[in-house]
């Protein structure tokens, strides 16, 4: 069984991964001209934003 500290560390890493992924999508969006591809990347980026919020909430719950 994981301790709260271990779980918090794990999900802090997950949070950082999600932030990094969102940044990659944003950088690609800025450099592309193809509206279809941009639309897909924006959708994925928005999903990453949701993952970031969920990871933050999960970390809060673990730490409480």
Language-model features: where?
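Non-heme di-metal
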Residues: 1-64
């Amino acid at each position: 069984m994981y301790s709260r500290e271990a779980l918090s560390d794990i999900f802090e890493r997950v949070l950082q991964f999600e932030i990094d992924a969102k940044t990659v999508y944003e950088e690609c969006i800025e450099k592309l001209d193809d509206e279809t591809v941009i639309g897909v990347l924006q959708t994925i980026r928005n999903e990453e934003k949701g993952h970031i919020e969920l990871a933050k909430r999960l970390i809060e719950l673990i730490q409480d």
